[in-house]
Amino acid sequence: MEFSRETRRLALQKMQERDLDLLIIGGGITGAGVALQAAASGLDTGLIEMQDFAQGTSSRSTKLVHGGLRYLKQFDVEVVSDTVSERAVVQQIAPHIPKPDPMLLPVYDEPGSTFSMFRLKVAMDLYDLLAGVSNTPAANKVLTKEEVLKREPDLKQEGLLGGGVYLDFRNNDARLVIENIKRANRDGALIASHVKAEDFLLDDNGKIIGVKARDLLSDQEIIIKAKLVINTTGPWSDEIRQFSHKGQPIHQMRPTKGVHLVVDRQKLPVSQPVYVDTGLNDGRMVFVLPREEKTYFGTTDTDYTGDLEHPQVTQEDVDYLLGVVNNRFPNANVTIDDIESSWAGLRPLLSGNSASDYNGGNSGKVSDDSFDHLVDTVKAYINHEDSREAVEKAIKQVETSTSEKELDPSAVSRGSSFERDENGLFTLAGGKITDYRKMAEGALTGIIQILKEEFGKSFKLINSKTYPVSGGEINPANVDSEIEAYAQLGTLSGLSMDDARYLANLYGSNAPKVFALTRQLTAAEGLSLAETLSLHYAMDYEMALKPTDYFLRRTNHLLFMRDSLDALIDPVINEMAKHFEWSDQERVAQEDDLRRVIADNDLSALKGHQEG
């Protein structure tokens, strides 16, 4: 279904003519998940996003659907259980996006190590049990030092004890957002990017009945009426709530910044994802991950109080991460000049969630008796000497000793909250990408109840565990072969097998729609046929309005295909200018915006400062 600039115009027109059941402010993964479930459940739904979809936070993650193995060190079993369960659901509803990618975790004999070899084995076995992959080909493996080095020969050898391999999943975070958004659009949601909420509309009793917003592309004020409004703006949540609390600061959020750096894989060669202690005795671990022909690594975790729209990578961030990777891969000698791209993102942490870190990890301590009992029970289960029920009982005992006290009953997942202010505004905040569906489900359960109680409207919430996102209509048990079949179809449209396979992986069950564009398109000047199809599909079916939308969020060109990016800039801008009928002034403005983003990402300012 079309999802274009024209779709946006019509959506804004219709939003101003209706009294929506639900208006969503924020088009990251949280808002996208709410929009999908709301529209599919029959609510008259609207969504506005002040930037591009996923631009703020949801495209700036570590790009994993991460199971959180390290939180089993404190036996925070609940968060890991929730995470691996939700990860399995996401794999079911978006099977073309999360892909299994076994993770290597080296263990070193040094102060502050997250795991000993013994604890790693217990944690991995428990993790497999929770993930339902025990006694399958995806089950964990314990590795000797020699086996670790055979897999990753460039790892630091000194102090290396061995390691483990366990199941994890890579993710395309921005694609997950846009596929949720597209499905919501197909189900009738009215959706527009580059529309900023500026204030609430209030009735005589001070209750919210809509939003005053501004179309940032035309600078026109827009009035949108809605029975209920939900704030899903992540780090901006406090700013939205501030509309009704002028002069009264709101500090629900405590954003922290996470930075990732990208280098060529020849500079930092890894054959599989690696998750390793920093070696700085700071209680942190970093990921070193292959993607395309690049390697990226991160992340930092520092409190942030600056510009929420444009968090920057600082020299301190670079020094920290280079120090870690050069310690763990001593022959790499990565310098700032090797960095081809980067990104800085904000984690929307809740300031009151003091017992948990950004992944919901519990900081409570486990008693020796509880730990020993759980270890013995897991061992017995693995040896078929005890039951799963016995393991679950032992887990409950550990949870009791480590759980957060007096958890807010309104929380719909660990590390997240769902609240309603006195003026009627709902705010769904916190959480992590893996939790997005569950968070939306919890929020919609409450919203549907309020719509019935306060407005007399009845809706039945869909079962979102089985409701695929756009592009996700693929058998989750047969993903590779179905993607390959789509790729074969692409070759019949004149694409090379490599290009067809790339597009099939990117678009999933929407790939035939992309290939069908060959009936009306030929390769644009300076672009391959595949690039032309991808660009036009992004403009007409994914509301890509700017070159940065295309290069950074509809595709990963700007992050992981830096070698070929420069040759694509002018042809892509030319094609977009023709498609959107940009003036010369608008074309220059769009190119300037793209060049600024590229300069930020490749750290031109920091590199120039060092040279100076």
From Swiss-Prot:
State if Cytoplasm is listed as a keyword: yes
Name one molecular function that GO assigns to this entry. glycerol-3-phosphate dehydrogenase (quinone) activity
Query: Which Gene Ontology cellular component annotation is one that this UniProt entry carries?
Result: cytoplasm
Query: Per the annotation, which location comes first and is thus the protein's main one?
Result: cytoplasm
Which keywords does this Swiss-Prot/TrEMBL entry list?
Cytoplasm, FAD, Flavoprotein, Glycerol metabolism, Oxidoreductase
Task: Region Disordered: list its residue ranges.
Answer: 399-418
Q: Where does FAD bind?
A: 21-49
Q: Which InterPro entries match?
A: DAO_C, DAO_C_sf, FAD-dep_OxRdtase, FAD/NAD-bd_sf, G3P_DH_FAD-dep
Which BP terms from GO are recorded? Answer: glycerol metabolic process; glycerol-3-phosphate catabolic process
Q: Where is the composition biased (Basic and acidic residues)?
A: 399-408
List its EC numbers. 1.1.3.21
What is the reaction catalyzed?
sn-glycerol 3-phosphate + O2 = dihydroxyacetone phosphate + H2O2
The family annotation for this protein states: Belongs to the FAD-dependent glycerol-3-phosphate dehydrogenase family.
**Record protein name field:** Alpha-glycerophosphate oxidase
Protein's organism: Streptococcus pyogenes serotype M1
Q: Which gene encodes it?
A: glpO
